[in-house]
Amino acid sequence: VIDQETKHYYQAGFLFIPFGIYTAKKVTKKISSYLPKGVEHLNIRVDLIKPEENKVIISDDRELAYDILIVASGCRIVPAEIEGMDGEGWRKDIFDFYTVEGSTALAEKLEGWKGGNLVVHVAEMPVKCPVAPLEFAFLADWYLAKKGKRAGTKLTYVTPLAEVFTKKRTSEILGPLMAQKNIEVVTDFAIEAVDSGNKVIKAYDGKEVPYDLLVTIPTNMGDEVFERSGMGDELNFIPTEKHTLKAKNHDNVFVIGDASDLPSSKAGSVAHAQAEVLTENILRHIEGKELLPDFDGHSNCFIESGYGKGFLIDFNYDVEPVEGTFPIPGIGPLKLLKESRINHLGKLAMNWLYWNLIIKGIKIPFMTSKMNLKGKKL
């Protein structure tokens, strides 16, 4: 395993740090604590990949040969892609919560918040965990009300989408909930620049949204090494076969998680579902067998809605989120597309499940890599 980091993060927990629900310590562990015995961890940066030569060049100029390369490099925020975003206002009145540093700095900012225009903004799609910006808006509404500061805050949600979410049925539920919580929604906002001097975000069509505090999800991109290596698309994501997880242009390269260009969500649940398919296909590749087209884009996402409640959605490439029960068909105990206390508790339970079961590859009962259509109102 080549990884320039020594720490691993439960990234879904970053959402809770700005509101004092989690600390950075709760979402951070040493990588070395989770690698199986016999697995070597090279704590170093990858500078270049030569897929035609089956070689990886690392930052000390060593060349490492491979028979199979598994890319699990994730994606990253790149605020520099938006004019003015990472300038004078960065981490002063412009913040992200997609990094542990950003979410920790934002916690301090929110603690001293006096009121004004709080704008939650998505720069462009795709982004990691596409429900997270919505969750932040809902939690900000709850948090500011708890602090007695909601009445003095105008809360605005700005998205490049035509609706609040990528899935229509979910938008039909969450859009009205935004209105109910007095969160203004600005859709179809294609950002051109951030004017941090005047505290305004500007769209290409001339629309402007003023802010006192901008919580943004900047452009998400794959690792720069794929641009240098000629392996990525315009956002440095690797073109990947959507059902087998093999890189489209390289027969012995496989991709898991956020590093691919797949039309599935960039989310932990997706990577978890992919892992089973990927493991089987790597074994089949070694044995010279045809790869199985078994990944169906399965994703399930908890959506925090504030005040100790949440939603849960379950979908794949072809099936939109629908009502039903999860994970046990007909029993639940979780309800799909319904706001409930138990869905919120399920979201919180994922932290323990992640560190103790999921990351260790321990199978969770009733959790399947493919979407189970039983118990759903299709």
Q: For each predicted feature, which ranges?
A:
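C-terminal auxiliary extensions adjacent to catalytic cores
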Residues: 312-378
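Residues at the starts of beta-strands that form the adenosine-phosphate
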Residues: 117, 152-155, 252
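A Rossmann-like FAD-binding core segment of flavoenzymes
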Residues: 39-56, 64, 145-240, 290
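FAD-binding beta-loop-beta segment adjacent to the flavin cofactor pocket
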Residues: 236-254, 305-325
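FAD-binding core/adjacent interface of flavoenzyme oxidoreductases
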Residues: 39-135, 139-148, 215
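Beta1-alpha1 glycine-rich phosphate/pyrophosphate-binding loop at the start
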Residues: 1-40, 124-168
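FAD-site-proximal beta/loop scaffold in flavoenzymes
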Residues: 77, 81, 87-114, 198, ...
